[in-house]
Amino acid sequence: MNNDRADLVIATLADAIALHERVKQSDPQPVLAAAAAIVEGLGRGGKLLLFGNGGSAADAQHVAAELVGRFQATRAALSAIALTTDTSVLTSVGNDEAFARVFARQIEALGREGDVALGISTSGRSPNVVSALDAARTRGLRTIALTGRDGGAVGRAAEIHVNVPSESTARVQEVHRTLLHVICDLVERAFVER
């Protein structure tokens, strides 16, 4: 039994490393473009609006915390808001309109031209993330999608698409976290160097 569990640990780590390696070998331009769009938006007084479901909601909150607080360097606070945290808004919009509108409605209320919307979806199929990216684009926000699998409708809804090509939700989430840390690092460096 212990050997089976040890094998599981080793196999899981090997899968995670293999996917990180695959993404490392891919084109870095979408990640660089995402960071540049965020730097440009924040540099012009805009804000970053982040959203996703489940683990992706947690990632949205994590990035907002890193930018409002600090990632690795002391610098001025950066305007980042996770649209996943206000349970009263989420439940009222979900109940009165539809769950597919919980993020789009907040984009309509909070988003302004020059802001940046970052939608996260491991499946690439989340209707509420697609709806929010559509609302953001209509309002003149830059749009970024961070997806898994083939990117799906979420990837197609965004101007900038960062994809982690895997069917494993857990492995996609792990690489998403790494890529989001890279984006935080790039954004933070841009503001520290100013």
Give the predicted meaning of each segment.
Residues M1-S26:
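Generic N-terminal amphipathic, Lys/Arg-enriched alpha-helix
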Residues K24-R44:
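A short, well-structured juxtamembrane/interface segment
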Residues A37-G111:
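Glycine-rich, small/polar surface segments that engage phosphate groups of diverse ligands
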Residues S56-Q61, R125-A132, V154:
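Short glycine/serine/threonine-rich phosphate/pyrophosphate-binding segments
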Residues T84, S121, T147, V162-A170:
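Short beta->alpha connector loops at strand-helix junctions that form conserved
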Residues A109, V116-A117, A170-R194:
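A charged, well-structured terminal subsegment
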Residues A117, T143, I160-N163:
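Short, well-ordered beta-strand core segments
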Residues L146-A158:
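Short, glycine/polar-rich helix-capping loops at beta-to-alpha or helix-loop-helix junctions
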